[in-house]
Amino acid sequence: WFAQGQYTRPQSLQYGGDTLQQGPKMILDWLKKNLNNTKKVFGIDLHTGLGKSGYDTILVPDDIKEDKYNILVSLFGDHVSPLDPTQGVGYRITGDIHSGIVKEFSSIEWLTITQEFGTFGPTTVFKNLRAENRWTQNNQLTNEKDIMNHWSRKNLLNTFNPNNKRWQQDLISRGNTVFKSVQEYLSKLD
């Protein structure tokens, strides 16, 4: 499945690099400064691309403990789906940002989800990923602005953030609903 990152073929789709990238490093640095006395965290990783346009799926690891899975189902109902391609829009992964963060902060009790909002069908997503990768690997430009403004980059941006007001409103509305459900759940733990 092409959505999963890979770390062995630098010229291929979804190459994640051979070192910790700037974005995850910034997140880890922020967490190190701000989680000193934290005992419990509910992490939400927001993604776009997979699934029916405008619908969100709450993706959870296959190996999630039953009690945590039941908590998530009680919060999010039938939006919950394991990272299993035979059971929904998810796909099997080896390592993700959640597992890395949980490992780094092992003294904290974590409950993590990926909230995945669908955009376009898999053919459109793959076509636009491939076009942008081809441009990235083969362009001869040296001006960063020209490189970034290529049509393939704009198409890829639209693939994961559609220029569609209804879709954007659905994402904001459902994102707020999930966030508020988590806040309410956490407030009851105190």
Briefly describe each language-model feature range:
Residues 1-190:
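C-terminal accessory segments enriched in acidic
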